[in-house]
Curated annotation (Swiss-Prot):
UniProt xrefs under PANTHER family: ARGININE--TRNA LIGASE, CYTOPLASMIC, ARGINYL-TRNA SYNTHETASE
Source organism (scientific name): Streptococcus pyogenes serotype M1
Motif ('HIGH' region): 121-131
Name this polypeptide is given: Arginine--tRNA ligase
Pfam family, one: DALR_1
Signal peptide as annotated in the record: none
C-alpha cells in the first residue's frame, strides 16, 4: 500500500463522514518538509461537524493510530503526518531489489489488446520531425500499456493512397529517373512532388491529369498500379531503416490502401441503418445530437468515398481483429474534429465500443517559430537530424570519457534518446520549437542528463563491487535519501497516471525529478565511505538505477551503463 492510501485509510477509520477516495484526493504535500510528509485539511468537515477546522484537526489527530507513522500532529486546521522513514525505505528498497525491472508491473489490462494507430507517414514523402511525435508518443504508450498489463498492438496506418499518387505518377512520367529513385527513393520522390506542386499552381491541367491517373489507379490500371507499388516498396525500405535506428517496431503496416475493398460494407451498414442523408448530391450522416455542427461527409457527389469512410472501415476491422479494450489514435491536434465525427458515426451505427476509442492529440513541431510543410519543401528530415544528434553525442562523450568502450553504440543511444526524450517531456498538447543543441545537452532537463545520472550510479556500483541481497534488510532515514525513496515509491502511480492520461510527459518529468534528486544526494553524501550506512546507501543507488532505467525504457530510451 502506498503512503497516501495508508494515510487516507487511517483517516477514514475516524472520519465516517468522508469516503476514503475523497480523503485521498484532499491530501496535500506541505510546502516545507518540516511540516510533515502529507497533510489533511479539515476545512471540508467544518460544515458537517459544525466545528472550527482547528478544533476538528486537533481532535482527529488524537484519535488516529500513530503506530504506522513517526508522528501525527495538528497544526492549525491541518493534520500533519510524519512517515516512518526507516520502515518505509526498507519496504521500498526490498520491493525494488526483489522485483528488479518488474517493479511497478500492474495487471489492469489483464492481457487485453490496445490498438495504437501511430507514426503513419505518407508514402513517397520524407519522414520528417513532424512524424516523429506520433511515432515516439505511440511507442512510449505501447511500453506503458504493457507495464499496465495490456497487450499493445502497434499499427502503422501508412498514407499509401490518395490523389498525391496521381501527382507523383504525372511527375515521374515527366521528369523521373529510375536509377536516381532507386538510389535515393524519398529524396528523388520529394523533389518530383515539390516540383509538380509548384507547376500545378500555375497550370490547372496538372491537377486534372493527376486526378485522371489516380482514377486509373483506383480502377486497377496495370501501369498506375505498378508505379504505385514501386513507390510504396521503396519508401517502406527507407522508413524501416529509420525505424530500426529509432528502435521502433510495428505489428501491422495495414495502410489506407488495405481498406479499399472494405468501404462498401460501411456504406451498406449506414444505408441499412437509414443513417445516410443526401446533401447537395453527397451522402452525409447528421451528428447534431452529439453537438457536432457539421455532418460527416461519407460519399462525394461524384461517388468518391472519403477519409472518414476509410477510417470507419479501419475501426470495424480493428475491433473484429483485435477485440480491443482501447483503441488510440496518436494523430496531430488538427484532426480533432475528424475523430469526434468518427466516434459519433460509430455511435450512431450502434457500436458502443466507440467509447473505448481515444484521439491522443499533440501539438506542432516548429522551426524558428515557423510551421513545417512538405509541399513547400520546408521540412526537418529525421534521418540527417538523427545522424547529427549522434555526432553531437559522440563529441561530448569523447570530451568526457575518451577511453570509453563501445563509443559508437553509446553515442547512438544518447543521440537517439535525446531526440525522443525532448519530444516526450513536452506536454503532448503543446508543440515545441526544434533545437538540436538543447536536445543533446548533458545539462538541464534532457535525455542525456537522465542517462548520465544512471551511468554515474552504475559506475558507483562497479567501484563498490556491490550487488544487493534480497535477504538483507536495508533502510535509510536521512532527508536526502528520503526524497529519492518517496519518488521510487510513487513510480507505480506515475505509470498509472501516464496511462490514464495518455501522457508520456508525466513519465519524462518523473525521470528528470529522480535524476535531479539523485544528483543532489550524490553531491551531499559520501556514498562509498566505509561505515555502517554504506550498504544502505548502495542499495538506494541500486534501486534508483533500476527505476531510472525502467522509466527511460518506458519512454523508448536506452540507458547505457557507461557514458
Amino acid at each position: 500500500m502506498d503512503t497516501k492510501t495508508l494515510i487516507a485509510s487511517e483517516i477514514a477509520k475516524v472520519v465516517p463522514e468522508l469516503e476514503q477516495d475523497a480523503i485521498f484526493n484532499l491530501l496535500e504535500t506541505p510546502k516545507n518538509s518540516d511540516m510533515g510528509d502529507l497533510a489533511f485539511p479539515a476545512f471540508s468537515l467544518a460544515k458537517v461537524l459544525r466545528k472550527a477546522p482547528q478544533m476538528i484537526a486537533s481532535e482527529l489527530a488524537e484519535q488516529i493510530d500513530e503506530s504506522q507513522f513517526e508522528k501525527v500532529v495538528a497544526v492549525g486546521p491541518y493534520i500533519n503526518f510524519f512517515l516512518d522513514k526507516a520502515k518505509i525505505s526498507s519496504q521500498v528498497l526490498e520491493q525494488v531489489i526483489t522485483a528488479g525491472s518488474d517493479y511497478a508491473q500492474q495487471d489492469e489490462g489483464q492481457g487485453r489488446n490496445v490498438a495504437i494507430d501511430m507514426s503513419s507517414p505518407n508514402i513517397a514523402k520524407p519522414f520528417s520531425i513532424g512524424h516523429l511525435r506520433s511515432t515516439v508518443i505511440g511507442d512510449s504508450l505501447a511500453h506503458i500499456f504493457a507495464k499496465m498489463g495490456y497487450k499493445p498492438v502497434k499499427i502503422n496506418h501508412l498514407g499509401d493512397w490518395g490523389k498525391q499518387f496521381g501527382m507523383l505518377i504525372v511527375a515521374y512520367k515527366k521528369w523521373g529517373d529510375e536509377a536516381a529513385v532507386q538510389a535515393h527513393p524519398i529524396d528523388e520522390l520529394l523533389k518530383l512532388y515539390v516540383r509538380i506542386n509548384a507547376e500545378a499552381e500555375t497550370d490547372p491541367t496538372v491537377d486534372e491529369e493527376a486526378r485522371e491517373w489516380f482514377r486509373k489507379l483506383e480502377d486497377g490500371d496495370k501501369e498506375a498500379t505498378e508505379l504505385w507499388q514501386w513507390f510504396r516498396d521503396e519508401s517502406l525500405l527507407e522508413f524501416n531503416r529509420l525505424y530500426d535506428q529509432l528502435h521502433v517496431t510495428f505489428d501491422s503496416y495495414n495502410g489506407e490502401a488495405f481498406y479499399n475493398d472494405k468501404m462498401d460494407e460501411v456504406l451498406d451498414l449506414l444505408e441499412a441503418k437509414n443513417l445516410l442523408v443526401e446533401s447537395k448530391g453527397a451522402q452525409v450522416v447528421n451528428l447534431e445530437k452529439y453537438g457536432i455542427e457539421h455532418p460527416a461527409l461519407i460519399k462525394k457527389s461524384d461517388g468518391a468515398t472519403l477519409y472518414i469512410t476509410r477510417d470507419l472501415a479501419a475501426a470495424l476491422y480493428r475491433k473484429r481483429t483485435y477485440d480491443f479494450a482501447k483503441s488510440v489514435y496518436v494523430v496531430g491536434n488538427e484532426q480533432a474534429a475528424h475523430f469526434k465525427q468518427l466516434k459519433a458515426v460509430l455511435k450512431e451505427m450502434g457500436y458502443d465500443w466507440s467509447d473505448d476509442m481515444t484521439h491522443v492529440a499533440f501539438g506542432l513541431v516548429t522551426k524558428g517559430g515557423a510551421k513545417l510543410s512538405t509541399r513547400k519543401g520546408n521540412v526537418i528530415l529525421l534521418e540527417p537530424t538523427v545522424a547529427e544528434a549522434i555526432n553531437r553525442a559522440a563529441s561530448q562523450i569523447e570530451a568526457k570519457n575518451p577511453n570509453l568502450a563501445d563509443k559508437e553504440a553509446v553515442a547512438h543511444a544518447v543521440g537517439v534518446g535525446a531526440i525522443k526524450f525532448y519530444d516526450l517531456k513536452t506536454d503532448r498538447m503543446n508543440g515545441y520549437d526544434f533545437d538540436l543543441e538543447a536536445m543533446v545537452s548533458f545539462e538541464g532537463e534532457t535525455g542525456p542528463y537522465v542517462q548520465y545520472a544512471h551511468a554515474r550510479i552504475q559506475s558507483i556500483l562497479r567501484k563498490a563491487d556491490f550487488t544487493p541481497s534480497a535477504t538483507t534488510t536495508y533502510s535509510l532515514a536521512d532527508a536526502e535519501s528520503w526524497e529519492i525513496i518517496k519518488l521510487i515509491q510513487d513510480f507505480p502511480r506515475i505509470i498509472k497516471r501516464t496511462s490514464d492520461n495518455f501522457e508520456p510527459s508525466i513519465m519524462a518529468k518523473f525521470a528528470i525529478n529522480l535524476a535531479q534528486s539523485f544528483n543532489k544526494y550524490y553531491a551531499h553524501t559520501r556514498i562509498l565511505d566505509d561505515n555502517s550506512e554504506r550498504d544502505n546507501r548502495l542499495a538506494l543507488c541500486y534501486a534508483t538505477a533500476t527505476v531510472l532505467k525502467e522509466a527511460l525504457r518506458l519512454l523508448g530510451v536506452d540507458a547505457p551503463n557507461e557514458m
